[in-house]
């Protein structure tokens, strides 16, 4: 009886592993040279309608500062910039990014963006910005279908309405995106307090809103 019971458990576990292979595969510690920070549509005419937008900008800047420090590449997308304005100066500053303009909601419909991902052989993409339930959702779903690991820091993304943001976040997590936070991802990229950059990373972490 014990053998039969254990066999049933093993069969259920095998079934679980098969059905959730994407979730398990995505549960890897980030490597800097395989990771891209993607900042989606943080534009002048969009941002101020977003719930808690100042906190979102604050956390995106923390991710930017960390990625610059650790040599993680950064890409920015802009949705119809002629109509919706350019990316906020607070995000751009004097930093060098890869820029991609788009009309489609999903960044993945931009062939130049897809070529960029392929060129640098990214395996992990941290996606932040706005809006969670439109451009971020469609981008992440498309990227997941390309077998990429997608990480979504909940405190660095948002929508105009809380219900849209929360519902999209749940769908993304169920679809295989890895739910996380800004601080967690910063520490995951840094990995150890023994590295030379940790002192500066620690300052970023201690910065309060």
Regions found by a protein language model. Name each.
Residues 10-12, 16, 54:
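Acidic/proline-rich low-complexity IDRs
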Residues 38-40, 74-79:
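Short beta-strand segments at enzyme active-site cores
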Residues 44-48:
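Short acidic, Gly/Ser-rich segments with clustered Asp/Glu that frequently serve as metal-coordination loops
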Residues 51-67, 72-75:
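A short alpha/beta connector and helix-capping loop motif
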Residues 49-53, 163-164:
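Short, solvent-exposed loop/turn segments at secondary-structure boundaries
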Residues 14-36, 69-72, 82-209:
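Active-site-adjacent betaalpha module
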Residues 1-12:
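N-terminal amphipathic/basic-hydrophobic helices that include classical n-h-c signal peptides
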């Amino acid at each position: 009886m014990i053998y039969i019971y254990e066999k049933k458990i093993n069969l259920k576990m095998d079934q679980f592993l098969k059905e959730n292979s994407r979730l398990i595969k995505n549960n890897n510690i980030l490597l800097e040279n395989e990771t891209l920070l993607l900042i989606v549509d943080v534009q002048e005419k969009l941002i101020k309608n977003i719930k808690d937008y100042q906190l979102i900008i604050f956390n995106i800047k923390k991710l930017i500062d960390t990625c610059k420090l650790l040599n993680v590449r950064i890409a920015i997308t802009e949705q119809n910039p002629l109509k919706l304005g350019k990316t906020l100066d607070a995000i751009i500053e004097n930093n060098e990014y890869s820029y991609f303009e788009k009309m489609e909601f999903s960044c993945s419909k931009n062939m130049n963006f897809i070529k960029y991902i392929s060129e640098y052989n990214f395996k992990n993409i941290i996606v932040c910005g706005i809006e969670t339930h439109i451009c971020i959702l469609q981008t992440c779903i498309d990227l997941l279908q390309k077998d990429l690991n997608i990480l979504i820091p909940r405190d660095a993304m948002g929508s105009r309405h809380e219900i849209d943001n929360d519902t999209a976040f749940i769908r993304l997590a169920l679809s295989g995106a890895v739910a996380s936070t800004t601080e967690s991802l910063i520490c995951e990229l840094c990995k150890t307090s023994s590295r030379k950059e940790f002192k500066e990373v620690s300052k970023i972490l201690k910065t309060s809103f």
